[in-house]
Amino acid sequence: MSQLIDRRQNAGKKSTVNRQRFLRRYKSQIKKAVSEAVGKRSITEIDQGEQITIPAKDIYEPQFHRGHGGHIERVLPGNDNFIAGDRIKRPGGGGSGGAGGNASDSGEGEDNFVFELSREEFLELYFEDLELPDLVKKELARISTYKTVRAGVTTSGIPNNINVLRSMKQATGRRVALASPYKRRLKEAEEELERLKQLANPDKLDILKLERDIEFFKKKIQTVPFVDTIDLRYNHRVRVPSPSTQAVMFCVMDVSGSMDEAKKDIAKRFFILLYMFLTKNYEKIELVFIRHHTSAKEVNEEEFFYSRETGGTVVSSALELLNTIIEARYPPQAWNIYVAQASDGDNWNADSPYCQELLQEKIMPLLQYFAYIEIMPRHHQSLWEVYQQVKERYPNFAMENIDNVADIYPVFRELFKRKTV
């Protein structure tokens, strides 16, 4: 049996299949190295490839080889320094070994295996098993828009949908099926008539009968219509549900004076991961960036991550702007709306109850998911407490705490992990 090997997806490299097999085999070691690399990178370097090191012991494979026991005397080809019976000195440097490995007493060692992950491979491993949670509407498991698609042909329809080619094929087949018996009998009658006419004394009654039969068969053939109504075929189109993944993700970040550079760096890392994750997995997702201190404003991606503007803390300003943008541009009937907010938890005490009111009465009924991360290595403040009350009321509200850079990856996965059925 023949076997086809399709290498069109190998990007012009014959070793791609072997590389993919290697990545699958040592996936756990590679994913561990990837998660460690994320914590060491700056935001601008997060979407680059990575040099991965795998300890030699992890890629060791058992091998069959000759045993070292017994007594063997032999002289290998090409030897011009020794003869049988000579004693060879042990090589020096018995403590040599691989980089990062233990010393060897045999003069041999093995380095760790180092290779480069491409940007695509790095992101694929990093974002594996992640999915924007609950991409559903409130009423249905999936939002469905309908589109019209071809579904073959049918025997009924309107003239505009006539399939001429299929109709003519059907008519040809019908004419052949109906006329063939008469054509065969017509041919036999004509041959018999020709034979009788060549006789010296033919029977005139037989000739007359054959002539009548021939005329009858010709009329029967002519009465077969060229196209009949039963031949007509119409293009059949049906409406099928088309799942909608039209979503908008609001990224809300606190840039007030209480957010020091370390906290801002953690928040920026979280949002850049979120941004990369969304753009990698979903083509029809819009991102809206809102940064706030005492006032909030919608900004572009560059200003969201790198602007140095700062001030006090009024979280409700961001929530009010969020609600205004949703009402103006993203009707919940047409959009799946998600919000991710990063803050240190500091807020004007009198403002926190208003934030709770905004979320519970106006914003949460419009959303599919709200993810809140609080960058707070110490005790939580009033904002966390009111958000806890929102979480108890709305199951689509999630909140997690981040203490340092090392917590970003686990928290990110927890907030956006793929749910199993």
UniProtKB/Swiss-Prot annotation:
UniProt-listed InterPro entries: UPF0229, vWFA_dom_sf
Sequence ranges of Gly residues compositional bias: 91-101
Residue numbers spanned by region Disordered: 83-110
UniProt cross-references to HAMAP family, sorted A to Z: UPF0229
Family the entry assigns: Belongs to the UPF0229 family.
Protein name (Swiss-Prot/TrEMBL): UPF0229 protein lpl2726
Protein's organism: Legionella pneumophila (strain Lens)
